[in-house]
Amino acid sequence: MRTGIYLFAFILLLSTAFISKPTRVVFFGDSITQAGVNPGGYIDMLKKTLPADQFELIGAGIGGNKIYDLYLRMEDDVLAKKPDVVVIWVGVNDVWHKASSGTGTDPDKFVRFYEAVIKKLQANNIRVVLCTPAAIGEKTDMTNQQDGDLNQYSAFIRDLATRYNLPLVDLRKAFQEYDLKNNPENKDRGVLTTDRVHLNEKGNQFVADQMKAVLTAGK
């Protein structure tokens, strides 16, 4: 009897040892990511579509954050959670705040601290996914006030993804292509955003779909 109990316990131990834990994913960003965990947000949508036994999704977004803010709070808000994957979605405030409050991030500082965030995560054996900032206005004729800067900062992120061989969710490109097909009136908002920047229902679903494609690649 006792031998049977020991044998059962041993088999149970072996079986649990081979049960893989869900991949823990932290979404690291600004107010768009902060809102992503709310009902109907893109992270909430991902939680409903990705298998819970394969993915654990955690939001780590704070409104107004720029790349330097992410760098400063990495330890408490990301590393302490011991993620397997970190999805970095930042850059819109680094550009937007240049015009709105004069507190944006200059290009050299943006790239330097973005690279520092990547290196810190990789030093902790965390897989990194990069995202380009999506929109500051949805007009399709390149007359949104900060299209030039947003394209430049998106190019910086694409370059970092190439140099570090990282997966990229190119939301800037995806939003531009979607708006070209679905914004015939050349509106500055209301297609994928509520206010030119933050996501509406369709925008959250669109981002969730883009994220899912990258997160499930190879699964």
Model-found features: residue ranges?
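Bacterial Sec-dependent signal peptides at the C-terminal "C-region" and cleavage site
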Residues: 1-24
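Non-catalytic interaction surface on structured domains
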Residues: 6, 39, 49-53
